[in-house]
Design a protein with these regions (language model features):
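Alpha-helical transmembrane segments of multi-pass membrane transport proteins
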Residues: 1-281
Length: 281
């Protein structure tokens, strides 16, 4: 009960800690990208590009999962988007049920570790709260033992910021993506019936290259702006989240067209619902 009250107070009363401001921004970014069908275009394009390779469709799912994780930071939107799109395609092309579902679940949860992860933001906030409490206790103990009010900084306790957490998780996330791809490729080579190659009836010409670039450039640009600004120290996590939210809104704006305002309402309802649920939990 005491820990719960402490967490509640740190969330709603400790106004000088603004780490959690980034959460609704990244949630907004993720849901807007999901509703604008970016995931569908990425999966279709990657499947056409890597389909002829053994296990190519599974590799495409992992790559798209990594791209969505790096642009959304939330797991639910990624798993739902890829499950609805890629699972029927994988089963229709005679993929193993276990490999298909395992690939989708594993690649969908990459959002837990690949920045900008909501989990890492919450973890950084909790570590900061714990470090503040431990620092206060250590200063009180130092004052009681030595009688001095100023404790040397070398004895103080510091915590990792959300940006530090992102920098620490970026390379392990890429390693995890590489391991997933190697596992699917190895399985497809050893047991071809579990992940057969899928032929592409079209031609790999300039038009196809333009199609691939048009599908990849928007999310890659958003990743570069958001993660690049954080990892290089140009912007804080909150500032990068705001830039990412604006970028996602622009990307969704030119896709949710035809002057049908009703297409926007499911996105806004989902955004407010997930944000409210996240802060309540």
């Amino acid at each position: 009960l005491s820990a719960g009250v402490t967490n509640f107070r740190s969330l709603y009363w400790n106004v000088e800690r603004d780490t959690l401001i980034a959460i609704p921004l990244f949630i907004f970014m993720g849901i807007m990208l999901q509703r604008s069908k970016v995931a569908e275009d990425l999966l279709v394009t990657m499947a056409q590009l890597f389909g002829p390779i053994p296990g190519g469709l599974g590799i495409s799912v992992v790559l798209v999962g990594a791209l969505l994780a790096a642009t959304t930071g939330i797991v639910g939107a990624t798993v739902i988007a890829m499950g609805m799109i890629s699972l029927p395609a994988m089963l229709r092309n005679k993929y193993s049920h276990s490999l298909a579902t395992g690939t989708i679940c594993a690649s969908g949860t990459l959002g837990q570790i690949i920045p900008p992860s909501i989990v890492l933001i919450i973890l950084a906030d909790q570590l900061s709260s714990a470090a503040d409490q431990a620092s206060a206790m250590r200063k009180a103990a130092y004052r009681e033992i030595t009688g001095e009010f100023s404790m040397p900084s070398v004895l103080d306790i510091s915590s990792a910021s959300a940006g530090d957490m992102f920098m620490g998780a970026f390379v392990p996330g890429l390693v995890l993506v590489a391991l997933y791809i190697l596992y699917i490729l190895f399985t497809a080579i050893i047991r071809p019936k579990m992940a057969p190659p899928i032929g592409y009836s079209g031609a790999y010409d300039r038009q196809f290259l333009v199609k691939v670039l048009m599908a990849l450039l928007p999310p890659l640009s958003l990743i570069f702006v958001v993660l690049g600004s954080i990892l290089t120290g140009v912007a804080t996590v909150n500032q990068a989240g705001a830039v990412g939210a604006v970028g996602a809104m622009l990307m969704a704006g030119y896709r949710l067209h035809h002057r049908d305002e009703r297409r926007y309402w499911p996105a806004f309802i989902a955004i407010f619902s997930v944000i409210a649920l996240g802060f309540i939990v």
